[in-house]
Amino acid sequence: MAAPHHLMPLPREDPVSWLTTSGTAGGSFAPTEAAAYFFDRLASMSVGLDSGFRRISTTSARLAVPRVLSDAVANWTAEGTEITPTDPNADVVTAVPRKLAALTYASNELVDDSQPDAQDVLATNLARAVALKLDWSFFEGSGTAPEIRGLKNQSGIQTLSMGANGAALTNLDPFADALGMLAEEDAEGTAIVMHPRNWRALTKIKETSGSAKPVLVDGAGAPTEGPRRSIQGVPVWLTSQLSTTETQGSATTANSIYVYQADQVCAVIRADADVKVDKSAAFSSDRTAVRVTLRADEVLPNPAAVVRILGVLPA
């Protein structure tokens, strides 16, 4: 699994000093360091970003990402003869970053009287809210404005069905099939993302009937990393943001698992997270407002580098 980001320590002066600079109420109170720190924390909490999505930063409202549909062809050529030219078939996919926002209020008593850890609580709360919604959007987003389009609704990805009415995981065959499907498209499986209930079911599968030895176990990992999970050497990430109410035939409690080459999934970020504080918005209730906005989109330059295993039922 990719190593987690090393978080920059918070300043330890005034409880919200990381959010405040000189200026008038309603202006931008977040220095560049605070926005960068916030995005680092967000990235470490987002399964999509942490799994290795290729991050592309832009300052434009739209970004064209090249996509090769078929490669140029090489041929053995006799000495002195013309080389037959071939051109790759290519087009572009256009990313249109859309706004994801979170807003929270803190009482001025909390801001004024709490220990310095209050700033850490606010930062963590907002980062977690944005990261969870970002992950939901990366995998489940409909593409209907203002939502971005997630992997589930991207055209051109590969699919592997667990059957007409779905099925629970009883072995690792679906993952072997998914990794094989990627290899057949000259892609490499570098990440597997599933709902926690799927991993729970997998860890209960035993090597043989009557055996108590599980097929999969969590690796210990370093204390700062948490458990290491993998299937056939491919890192596994868990997120609760995958739907568990998909319909597969007569089943209505299915979910999907995604196996992909992470650098073929592009997270396009329109500038950094923007953090603002305003003491006037909730003047009548004596509270301070903290707002975070982020503009992002997701595009696939090679959709075949993603396999969706659909129709996975609870064990």
Where do the PLM segments sit?
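Short amphipathic
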Residues: R67, L100-A106, L238, V292
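Short loop/turn segments at secondary-structure transitions that flank enzyme active sites
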Residues: L69-A74, A101, L110, L132, ...
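Extended oligomerization regions of viral-like shell subunits
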Residues: T59, A64, T144-S284, T288, ...
